[in-house]
């Protein structure tokens, strides 16, 4: 399983049940790198990918059905993802929901900088499971 998330500098994901930020460049990059696979998302994330309906499957239990999952509002500590892709906003936003993945089980495999539409720089990090 591959998990894709967006984080601020403190590992925040949400504030008051709302996403911290968004950038269309992230969605474009996610879809561009699907390599023919479907992206599984929750109804919460559907608005982000409405332009990519042929590439996306929306369902409540997407974490148990999908191989590639974009996650915004789920606890991830029990997921045994082989790969975690993080898009970092490179700033701090208010947050009350944080990423709970134990990254001691992962190693940074790749890192790239993206020029965002609403963010000057977005850092993409790809982590592979080592344990």
For every predicted segment, state its role.
Residues 1-131:
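Enzymes that bind and transform nitrogen-containing heteroaromatic metabolites
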């Amino acid at each position: 399983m591959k998990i894709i998330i967006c984080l601020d500098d403190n590992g925040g994901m949400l504030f008051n049940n709302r996403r911290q930020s968004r950038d269309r460049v992230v969605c474009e990059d996610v879809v561009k790198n699907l390599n023919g696979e479907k992206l599984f998302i929750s109804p919460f994330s559907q608005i982000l990918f409405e332009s990519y309906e042929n590439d996306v499957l929306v369902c409540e239990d997407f974490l148990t059905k999908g191989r590639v999952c974009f996650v915004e509002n789920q606890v991830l500590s029990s997921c045994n993802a082989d790969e975690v892709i993080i898009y970092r906003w490179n700033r701090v936003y208010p947050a009350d929901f944080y990423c709970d993945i134990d990254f001691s089980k992962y190693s940074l495999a790749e890192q790239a900088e993206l020029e965002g539409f609403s963010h000057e720089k977005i850092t993409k990090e790809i982590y592979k499971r080592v344990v």
